[in-house]
A protein has these predicted regions:
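Solvent-exposed, acidic/flexible segments
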Residues: 118-125, 225-237, 258-266, 330-341, ...
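Surface-exposed patches in mature extracellular/periplasmic domains of secreted proteins
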Residues: 135-153, 251-260, 280-287, 355-362
Length: 400
């Protein structure tokens, strides 16, 4: 018997252990940064008059902290207007505000020519004019308005463009109007810090807009009202309303007896620029109104400081029609603008903002201001003067 070789038993291989995977580390979450809270603007502590004069403080005009409640009582007639005098501004604003919101614009064609070195600080020209147009939608308005905008560097250019524009006008028109561009600029300050709105003999509107660079304007008048006029379009609205005044009264503009006093023309334009451009905010209307009147409050200072003294006596004298012959030239500039705006507010509060253009329409039919006032406002002008003087004086005496 053959003995076979003993088979060699192959050892069972020891399995190579699988490598234990290295666990992926759980990422440490990035902490969500805590947002830095936006600091609540702090209202600067300053006097009433300093607030009106103030430039921007920490990015904001101090006047913009002011808010104004809706008055509970509004005037309805000459009989209750003094008693409810704290509601005059709101009632007047409400009248023009509603029309600017809801009425249809009658704005004609607008042509804007800007100097080669001039940058407009406000560019929504047509929308600004359109708000005024809507507010007075039933009144006559120019079918064409040409605006020439220029800074001091472009004064000669503007003068040439303007003279070409009026080249076909009669000599009588040129005598009264041809120097306008040159008259608007100050050689000593090197600025054209003014604007003019009027019509030609065909009833087409012309607006001459002096433009002051932002930084230079801040050195001339850093206040909120100056900013609003330049950069929020109030000057555009003001001058467009002047073209409406001239369009309506037409040939009678140069007949003194059938033209309103200069304070009525300018005071109504100040009211309209503010009411139309700030139609959506009574607070904004009141802020501009206060700052624009900064020279007429008692805390302003003396006349030597350029301030205006407002009293019943000065207002009664100012409102006298005996000053027609001198065109009120013996009164401070501000009396014919911001102080007169307060008189206009009273009239609008009683009879509505369209009473302003209604007066021009009536005077265009060869009626005097006294006749027009009685016809539109239902009281003789002489009877209204003491009440108007009393109301306006009370407003300034009480910082309203």
């Amino acid at each position: 018997q053959l003995i076979g070789a003993t088979p060699t038993v192959s050892p069972t291989p020891t399995p190579t252990p699988s490598a234990t995977p290295t666990p992926t580390p759980t990422p440490t979450p990035t902490p969500t940064p805590t947002p830095t809270p936006t600091p609540t603007p702090t209202r600067p502590s300053m006097s009433f008059i300093d607030m009106l004069r103030s430039p921007v403080v920490n990015g904001r005009y101090p006047i913009t902290f002011e808010t104004f409640p809706t008055p509970s009582k509004l005037p309805t007639s000459w009989e209750d207007v003094y008693e409810n005098r704290e509601g005059i501004a709101y009632k007047a604003w409400l009248s023009i505000s509603e029309a600017a919101k809801t009425s249809k614009s009658s704005l004609g064609t607008i042509k804007v020519t800007t100097g080669p070195n001039t940058t407009l600080p406000f560019t929504d020209i047509e929308p600004a004019m359109s708000l005024v147009s809507k507010a007075f939608s039933g009144a006559g308005q120019p079918s064409l308005v040409t605006m020439i905008a220029f800074n001091y560097q472009d004064q000669s250019w503007a003068d040439g463009v303007y003279r070409q524009l009026i080249a076909s006008e009669p000599d009588s028109f040129k005598r009264n109007h041809q120097e306008y561009v040159l008259d608007m600029c100050s050689a000593s300050r090197k600025v054209c810090w003014s604007a003019m709105g009027f019509t030609n003999t065909a009833g087409e509107g012309i607006i001459l807009l002096g433009v002051v660079e932002r930084e230079k304007l801040r050195t001339l008048d850093p206040s909120y009202s100056s900013y609003s006029r330049s950069e929020e379009g109030l000057t555009i609205a003001h001058e467009y309303f002047h073209t409406v005044q001239r369009k309506i009264i037409d040939k009678n503009w140069f007949r003194m007896e059938f033209t309103p006093p200069i304070w009525f023309n300018e005071g109504s334009a100040v009211f309209v620029e503010n009411g139309a451009m700030n139609f959506n905010s009574f607070d904004r209307y009141m802020r501009f109104r206060l700052v624009d009147s900064k020279l007429a409050y008692p805390s302003c200072g003396t006349t030597a400081d350029g301030c205006i003294t407002v009293s019943e006596a000065t207002m009664t004298n100012f409102l006298s029609l005996s000053h027609y012959s001198t065109n009120w030239s013996n009164f401070p500039f501000g009396m014919k603008y911001e102080v007169s705006q307060r008189v206009i507010e009273v009239l609008v509060a009683i009879k509505g903002h369209k009473s302003l253009t209604d007066l021009y329409t009536y005077m265009a039919q060869d009626h005097t201001f006294e006749q027009g006032f009685k016809h539109i406002y239902g009281i003789s002008y002489e009877s209204a003067i003491p009440l108007l003087a009393k109301i306006v004086t009370d407003q300034f005496a009480n910082n309203r």
